[in-house]
Amino acid sequence: MARTKQTARKSTGGKAPRKQLATKAARKSAPTTGGVKKPHRYRPGTVALREIRRYQKSTELLIRKLPFQRLVREIAQDFKTDLRFQSAAIGALQEASEAYLVGLFEDTNLCAIHAKRVTIMPKDMQLARRIRGERA
């Protein structure tokens, strides 16, 4: 559709402004007591999307090093006591573990989307592992 030039028109009156109700007028004229401002809140999902973009850009490890190291030592004790680990070995285990978990969560998210949901559930993770052949 072609754009046309707008010309100024003189207003021909119109409706008179309505009178405010007494309650509205009283509410507007009442002074704000305390002056406490509500803290700013982002809409649901905004922060989540920002975090997704941030973590997809980054390459750093997401699990803290010491808790992961304690977990590895605790699991290793079931197989052999007094095992010692090089720091590089713990680092390699952590890299592999995080790569596995990220991939599993990606597949889990695809399963949830396939079910027309945006929230992942345990059944999505079970399905992802079953399709991968990790669990019968």
From Swiss-Prot:
Pfam families per the UniProt record, alphabetical: Histone
Major location category of this protein: nucleus
Modified residues (N6,N6-dimethyllysine): 5, 10, 28
Processing after translation: Acetylation is generally linked to gene activation. Methylation at Lys-5 is linked to gene activation. Methylation at Lys-10 is linked to gene repression.
Keywords, comma-separated and alphabetical: Acetylation, Chromosome, DNA-binding, Methylation, Nucleosome core, Nucleus, Phosphoprotein
N6,N6,N6-trimethyllysine, modified sites: 5, 10, 28, 37
A GO MF term: structural constituent of chromatin
Modification sites for Phosphoserine: 11, 29
Complex formation: The nucleosome is a histone octamer containing two molecules each of H2A, H2B, H3 and H4 assembled in one H3-H4 heterotetramer and two H2A-H2B heterodimers. The octamer wraps approximately 147 bp of DNA.
UniProt name for this protein: Histone H3.3 type 2
Species this chain originates from: Caenorhabditis elegans
